[in-house]
Amino acid sequence: MSESQPGASSTTSNKCDSGFIPGDDTFTQWRNIFSILMGKMTDEGKEQFRVARDLRNEAADCKRCEDQRDYLLQYSPVIRYLSDNIRQLGGDLHSHNIYCRRCTNRKAGGFDPEYGILLCANEMKDQGHLEDTMAHEMIHAYDHLRFKVDWSNNLRHAACTEIRASSLSGECRWAREFFRRGQWKFTQQHQECVRRRAILSVRARPGCKDEAHAEKVVNEVWDSCFRDTRPFDEIYR
């Protein structure tokens, strides 16, 4: 009996500290949801809840992501257009190297020149979000083949491809900013979104010193990279 007491104490302590109650049954899940709605769960508890939910739904999330990925590869005009242009440059992106996985670092996706594209299945809100994410990463793939991007050592290269990916993928269109991110400005909204997301991305790179450094690099390449809409004739979405 004495051996079980520390575990029980730990569970009680965890609940008191964060407000999160471990458990996969429906009753426990609803208790956690109500705790969040009532403002009784800490940020740490909310993250514990999200991790538990993502683990519980991993198979279903990945299956839905794969089904939507395959549909978009076949029927989405922007995804098909980018696929064709990547193929013309000697690349090949299809279901065999566009992976749906559960991610732990709260990002939507990523591109790696060796392995392909990662789609974070547990972060996808809907098929539109998945389409924007695929388009974003496919523009990185296009840039890698077309412009020989130095991902590791050149922050200007990284800033330029982030500007282009955010501008051309559709993730910065007005409706997405207004309804998803609470950005309610009507003038210069697209440019501000692109700039903001490019700075955040550059800031996260190892060679970047701080936010001021990231902003400086983005500003240095802004004019030429924002105007460059290749492979599109203009901003498509």
Curated annotation (Swiss-Prot):
Enzyme class of the recorded protein, top EC level: hydrolase
Subcellular location: Mitochondrion inner membrane
EC number: 3.4.24.-
Coiled-coil ranges (or none): none
Active site, per annotation: E137
Gene Ontology biological-process annotations: mitochondrial protein processing; mitochondrial proton-transporting ATP synthase complex assembly
Membrane topology note: Peripheral membrane protein
Keyword field: Hydrolase, Membrane, Metal-binding, Metalloprotease, Mitochondrion, Mitochondrion inner membrane, Protease
PROSITE patterns, per database record: ZINC_PROTEASE
Any single Gene Ontology cellular-component annotation: mitochondrial inner membrane
GO molecular function: metal ion binding; metalloendopeptidase activity
Function of the molecule: Has a dual role in the assembly of mitochondrial ATPase. Acts as a protease that removes N-terminal residues of mitochondrial ATPase CF(0) subunit 6 at the intermembrane space side. Also involved in the correct assembly of the membrane-embedded ATPase CF(0) particle, probably mediating association of subunit 6 with the subunit 9 ring.
Entry's family note: Belongs to the peptidase M76 family.
Name of this chain's protein: Mitochondrial inner membrane protease atp23
Organism: Aspergillus clavatus (strain ATCC 1007 / CBS 513.65 / DSM 816 / NCTC 3887 / NRRL 1 / QM 1276 / 107)
Taxonomic lineage from the root: Eukaryota, Fungi, Dikarya, Ascomycota, Pezizomycotina
